Each structure stands twice: as C-alpha cells, then as structure tokens.
Amino acid sequence: MRLEIGNIFIKDIQFGEQTKVENGVLYVNKDEMIKKLSVIEHIKSVDLDIARPGESVRITPVKDVIEPRVKVEGPGGIFPGVISKVETDGSGRTHVLKGAAVVTTGKVVGFQEGIVDMSGVGAEYTPFSKTLNLVVIAEPEDGIEQHRHEEVLRMVGLNAGVYIGEAGRSVTPDEVKVYETDTIFEGAAKYPNLPKVGYVYMLQTQGLLHDTYVYGVDAKKIVPTILYPTEVMDGAILSGNCVSSCDKNPTYVHCNNPMVEELYAMHGKEINFVGVIITNENVYLADKERSSDWTAKLCKFLGLDGAIVSQEGFGNPDTDLIMNCKKIEMEGVKTVISTDEYAGRDGASQSLADADVRANAVVSNGNANMVIVLPPMDKTIGHIQYIDTIAGGFDGSLRADGSIEVEIQAITGATNELGFGYLSAKGY
C-alpha cells in the first residue's frame, strides 16, 4: 500500500471572508464554519478563537486535537466510518495543513480533559503549544448525558477538522512524503537479511468515556487485527476518550504516530517494518487474556523478530501492557515497551501497576505525578473553573493570581506514550 502525504506548511491562521489557504496563511470564514458546526445534534452553541505559539493564552479543558486533512486521490476519505463512508484508507494522496490544529474545548465532560498553555513553562510540556490552534468552543444542550456530551464534542472536532482540511484540496503542497508498505512476502524477499519488526498499538478502551474508534467501531468490540501503517494517517483511528490528558492520544497524534514515522524511516535500512497490530485495553480479565493471546499469536504468525508495544493510559492498562510483553516474548519475539510512569511526586514509587521479568526493555516517557506551577496567562479560552477537579489537579490548584499548581498529568500530551512530545533523556 502506498500513500503520499502532501504537507502544506501553515504560517498563520486568520479569520477572513473565505476559508482558504493563501501564501501559507489559513483564512477561516468564522460565520460559515460556525453555521456548519451548529447543525450537529445536541449542540447549544459554537464559537471560534485562535491561539498562536508564544501568546499568553491558556486553553482548558482540552477535549481533543485534530489535524486538518483532506483526501485528494485514492479510495476512502478522512475519518472513515465516522465522517466519510466506510472504505479502506491509507493509499492514494492526502493533503495536510501542517502546523495547524483544531482544538476542541467546552464544559468539562468527565474530569480528565487537559490544559494547553501557548507560552511559559507549561508550553514546554505540550506539543500543541507549537501549533497554530483554531479553538472550537462547543457547548452542548443543557442536561445532556455524559456519553452524549463526549460524542457531541468529538463530532464537532472531527467535522471542524474536515471543513478546514478542504481548504488544502487544490493547494500545491510544500513537500510530498511517500510511505509504502510491501506485502509480508514481498518484504521478506526484498530484505532477507533485515530483522522483521512489527508495532503493537494499544488503544484505550476501558469504557465510561475511555474509548477509541477504528473505522467507526468502538475498539472495545474488536479482537486484535492487522493494519497497514498508512491507514492511521488517514484517520482510521480516532480518540473518543477523556483519560488523563498527559498520556491520552488525541486524534492528531493518531494521525501523526511517531512510532509509525520512525519505523518507516528505518524500513529497508535497519529493519523490515512488517506492519501494525492494533489491540485494546478492556477492563475484564477474560478480554485481557483474549486480546493478549491474539496479539502474541499475530506477532508469531507474521514471523516477527522484534516488536515495539506502546500503551495508552495507565493503571488498569498496565496489566494489558505487561501481558502483551510477556506473551510476545514467550513466542520468541524480542519486545520493547513504551509507557509512562505514575511514580509519585518524588518519583520513588512503583512506576507501573504490574511487572514481569520479561519486560526488560522499557522506554519511559516521563513521570506524570511531577508537580509544576503554571504562570498566569492574559487570556483563557474555555472554562478555568475546572482546574481543581481535572486529573492532576487538586483543591487549591487554581490560585488567586491565576497561576496553577498541578501535576503534569493535567497537561495535554506531557507524557505521551508514543513519544509525541518534548521530554527526552540523554545517555553518558
């Protein structure tokens, strides 16, 4: 499968009379966009704002982040099974408004939406302080149930991303990247001396607002299966969850999965990148056993020499992570796991809720319990009053002067387990 990604570099976002991209500037017809989003069921009100890198702006509570994309050649469309019809994605050509993002906010859905600061120390912990953000402030009808509230914000964000993405349909990209995956037999014949490596992509599916969607299907209801890596770039996997914002994968991150990107970069040089296995993180033990069994079985079936396993979330999914690692290793496949830690504010507690001696190659993306003080911002987009109750906050987090003392758990993307962030380590 071959996919061309045409990146159109966006240097600024402005409101204008027509939604278009011109000389690197994304112009948005605010009234037209609000009108299109206001027809979504159960929406009470919609407004738009813009937040740029370096501005004294805080966005909270952040529900999701979406990168504007449009399918210009080939089968399928963006966000298949949800926005476009159900058809296999991941081939043809897709244009991306690189540097732009749609950020959804509104009244808090559960208690785990996050914070994005566009400047100050908090900006160093979120990748979305570097994007030009079109913020959609969406308020649902009064008295709506929580799961419907989440769905409303999710659909507003996805529709907003598709609307903005259309502005790039006829624009000549600034760069075109090509991603191509051979069949298993073609790859083995082409690279007989390279180790066969697969990527096990764990999806948050605990339920109760902790959901992920694959081609529109609630991933709680799937068994592990194989995807072409390029399918995720067209939005085959969507975030629908309100898990702690530091380590949940927003839809933007699913479309820009750095694990997939790095494995493609190594393909044909250091490794033979065979493909992606997606699996879930259900709460029942029988589901965990079934999914980890199937994941290990698929790794063996593909003849992998090595596998990288990434987690989403923490706590209960730590068990899924360790079960996957243990069983894949038992099939003779060398395994590396990528996670984050909840090791207490002093970093001295057990990092994961589960462990096994076979989990001996671990990448940590940071300790979510680390405490930070965010300075006051001149402007807040959204609702600041939820700071004390979101995950990572506590009674008194929001101070009288507008500063915030929180664990970095509250910052969107701070310890992203795919490595989509700015925390790093150096070896000496």
Curated annotation (Swiss-Prot):
The active site is at 242 (schiff-base intermediate with substrate). Keywords: Oxidoreductase, Pyruvate, Schiff base. It comes from the Bacteria. The keyword Magnesium does not apply. GO terms for molecular function: glycine reductase activity. Coiled coil: none annotated. InterPro entries: Gly/sarc/bet_Rdtase_B_asu/bsu (IPR016585), Gly_reductase_pB_sua/b (IPR015417). In the first step of glycine reductase, the substrate is bound to component PB via a Schiff base intermediate. Then the PB-activated substrate is nucleophilically attacked by the selenol anion of component PA to transform it to a carboxymethylated selenoether and the respective amine. By action of component PC, acetyl phosphate is formed, leaving component PA in its oxidized state. Finally component PA becomes reduced by the thioredoxin system to start a new catalytic cycle of reductive deamination. Heterohexamer of two alpha, two beta and two gamma subunits. Component of the glycine reductase complex, together with components A and C. PB is substrate specific. This is Glycine reductase complex component B subunits alpha and beta. It comes from Peptoclostridium acidaminophilum (Eubacterium acidaminophilum).
